[in-house]
């Protein structure tokens, strides 16, 4: 999977809109877990932003799930595909 700012992307969900969310891990970072929103371009390149950083994988998984659910409800968007690292 992709590495962003030293974080390996463990999981990602992309919506039909080209937006999505990712969960990353960097065991050497002070906050080893992150969730990001991203925008995926036509060539598949992703721009990551609005990171939320935490210290536990359980927290990161909950945050990832909440962000995906909130986006689905707010924009009535379907998940196009998910990836697991």
Task: Tell where the protein language model's regions lie, with residue ranges.
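Glycine-rich loops and low-complexity Gly/Arg-rich segments
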Residues: 47, 59-62, 76-78
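A short, charged, amphipathic alpha-helix used as a generic interaction element across diverse proteins
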Residues: 55-72
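Intrinsically disordered, low-complexity charged/polar segments
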Residues: 75-85
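Short N-terminal "domain-start" leader segments
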Residues: 1-34, 77
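Sequence-level detector for tyrosine residue identity
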Residues: 7, 48-49, 53, 71, ...
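Short aromatic-glycine-(Arg/Gly/Cys) micro-motifs in beta-strand/loop hairpins
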Residues: 23-51, 67
């Amino acid at each position: 999977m992709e590495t962003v700012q030293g974080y390996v992307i463990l999981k990602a969900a992309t919506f039909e809109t080209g937006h999505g969310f990712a969960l990353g891990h960097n065991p050497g970072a002070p906050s080893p877990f992150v969730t990001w929103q991203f925008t995926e371009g036509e060539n598949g390149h992703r721009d990551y932003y609005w990171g939320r950083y935490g210290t536990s994988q359980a927290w990161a998984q909950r945050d990832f799930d909440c962000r995906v659910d909130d986006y689905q409800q707010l924009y009535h968007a379907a998940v196009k595909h998910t990836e697991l690292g």
